[in-house]
Amino acid sequence: MIKVVVDTGITVSAAFRDRTPEEVILFIVEQEEFEWIISPAVLEEYTEVLARKKFNLSPEILQKWREMFEHFTTMIEPDIEIDFPRDQKDAKLLECALAGEADYLITGDKDFTEARKLVQTTIISVSQFKQLIVDKWS
């Protein structure tokens, strides 16, 4: 099983039907060999950010994403805390990746460059993941 953590920014981009993020997320949920890992803190961030007024997502789209999180993710309870001074709010994603023994953390956030020495997880952009994994797998 290939375990993946997806940064909130990638999820938001996919909700707006941005082609590459949406394609990558659909690939992850459709392939039995892949597991999308989240924690309660990550789920809370996903739902809070997607519901922000500035994004103006319809109730139907928000419901679609809530259902996707419910049915196509694996919830874990990280029992570790990571001090990530670069951006402490991103620590929850690193904790999820570490506790869930994720193979990949997909992000567009440059702050995670410094995190490479904190986790064994491969930190990769959505376009790199598409090129290295999705395009070769399909």
Predicted regions and their residues:
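Metal-dependent nucleic-acid phosphoesterase active-site entry motif
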Residues: M1-R19
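Alpha-helix capping/helix-boundary segments
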Residues: I10-T11, V42, D111-F112
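Residues at secondary-structure transition points
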Residues: T20, I37, E60, F84, ...
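PIN/NYN-family metal-dependent endoribonuclease catalytic core
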Residues: V6, P21-A51
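Membrane interface segments of multi-pass transport proteins and intramembrane proteases
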Residues: F55-S58
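Acidic, PIN/NYN-like endoribonuclease modules and their adjacent C-terminal/linker elements
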Residues: G100, K110-S138
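Active-site neighborhoods of divalent-metal-dependent phosphate/nucleic-acid chemistry enzymes
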Residues: H71-Y104
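A secondary-structure boundary/capping signal
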Residues: V6-T8, I38-S39, G108-D109, S125
